[in-house]
Regions:
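Short hydrophobic/aromatic beta-strand immediately N-terminal to the Walker A/P-loop
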Residues: 58-59
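Hydrophobic positions on the alpha1 helix immediately C-terminal to the Walker A/P-loop
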Residues: 71, 75
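Conserved short hydrophobic interaction patches
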Residues: 78-79, 130
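Conserved lysine of the Walker
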Residues: 68
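The conserved Walker
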Residues: 63-65, 212
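P-loop NTPase motor-domain active sites and their immediate coupling elements
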Residues: 2-36, 41-43, 47-49, 54-55, ...
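P-loop NTPase switch/communication element
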Residues: 53, 80-118, 122-125, 223-224
Length: 394
């Protein structure tokens, strides 16, 4: 305690904080960290950094234009500058398609930047499979986490330098730039994947950064909040939004333009930081440098559905696999071809189904090319004609 009282007054002119300035000042500390990221400067003018491996997952939220995307870019560039491609791999999910797509070609990426929300859901499910695979490897080597595994592999490499089958395990950082878009497309699958990654993936060296500009409870659900202990709040419109992010007020009083409250895991009081800024020109120079040093080699299977991910995505909460066709599926296909049009409400009336079941069947018909895409409130057009159906049966 002190015998004085301090009152925070914002400066008339905001002084920008450059990423380069923070990295140069904290270079030694960052080199000793597993996953160092640059945050900015606190109210005393001290440069602030964080280690994602200790975070271990991070929620970034704030209203439009408050500085979220700049913060995400500074995190990515901190990792590109301080770590080699074999030390850390990035999975970037960018539903907005313009914010992170310029990182394509960087060797640190595990796969090309994911812009399709449906592919993003599949990518998250494949990350869960990678986590399970890593735990199997840990069990085989009798180690508890990625640090123990890499130490054991390093010792084996020193003993057998000619053995090319021994490799160190790289960290994986998954960055989602806009969670709200993913929750609209596949909220159940995305929420399940986030829950599994945040609960178990830390020891496997997989870390998650989730950003959203809609800090409402339908996006930042209880499951997401409970499993992501570290938070960054930028300026928001109301105290309710601040409570959704930080479980306390304060973010509604921030100034915007990178002014943030950082609440790391285990801390009760958030730290006020002026977030660092990185220009588009600097980002391009970092990308050009890293791309020149090494050719990118991507794993395209991350965004592709396989048998394992299909079983994850189609299993319900109670473990029931909904990948099997509905018992009425063939009858509904015949009905659709006869009538030439189909809708969820039509199936409800004709087959006496509940709305959820009818909507699932309509989605399945579209997925298999039986009916066309949604056209406002009109019934869906059937793409398979009667004579074609008869030919296939013959």
């Amino acid at each position: 305690g002190k015998t004085t009282v301090g009152v925070e007054i914002p400066n008339k002119i905001t002084v920008g904080v450059q990423v380069r300035e923070v990295i140069q000042d904290k270079q030694k500390e960052m080199m000793s960290m597993k996953l160092p990221v640059s945050l900015g400067k606190d109210i005393n003018g001290n440069n602030c950094i964080a280690d994602l491996s200790k975070t271990p997952h991070l929620l970034v939220a704030g209203s439009t234009g408050s500085g979220k995307s700049v913060c995400i870019n500074s995190f990515i560039n901190s990792l590109l500058i301080t770590k080699r491609p074999d030390e850390v791999k990035l999975v970037l999910v960018d539903p907005k398609k313009v914010e992170l797509s310029n990182y394509n070609g960087v060797p640190h990426l595990l796969c090309p930047v994911v812009t399709d929300p449906k592919k993003a859901s599949i990518a998250l499910q494949n990350i869960v499979k990678e986590m399970e695979k890593r735990y199997d490897m840990f069990a085989d080597e009798k180690v508890k986490n990625i640090v123990g595994y890499n130490e054991k592999m390093s010792a084996m490499m020193k003993k057998n330098p000619e053995d090319k089958t021994i490799h160190l395990m790289s960290y994986i950082v998954v960055i989602i730039d806009e969670l709200a878009d993913l929750m609209l497309v596949a909220s159940k699958e995305v929420e399940d994947s986030i829950m599994r990654i945040t609960q178990m993936a830390r020891a496997a060296g997989i870390h998650l950064i989730v950003a959203t500009q809609r800090p409402s409870t339908d996006v930042i659900t209880g499951v997401v909040k409970a499993n992501i202990p570290s938070r960054i709040a930028f300026a928001v419109a109301s105290q309710i939004d601040s409570r959704t992010i930080l479980d306390m007020g304060g973010a509604e009083k921030l100034l915007g333009k990178g002014d943030m409250l950082y609440k790391p895991m285990g801390e009760n009081t958030p730290l006020r930081i002026q977030g660092n800024f990185i220009s588009d020109d600097e980002i391009e120079r970092v990308i050009a440098y890293t791309s020149k040093e090494q050719v990118a080699s991507y794993d395209e299977s991350i965004t592709q559905m396989n048998q394992n991910t299909e079983s994850i995505s189609t299993a319900g909460v109670g473990g029931r696999d909904t990948s099997e066709d509905d018992p009425l599926y063939n009858e509904i296909v015949d009905f659709a071809i006869e009538t030439g049009k189909v809708s969820a409400s039509l199936l409800q009336r004709r087959f006496r189904l509940g709305y959820n079941r009818a909507a699932r069947i309509v989605d399945l018909l579209e997925e298999r090319g039986v009916i066309g895409p949604q056209n406002g409130s009109k019934p869906r057009e059937v793409l398979i004609k009667m004579d074609k159906q008869e030919d296939t049966e013959e």
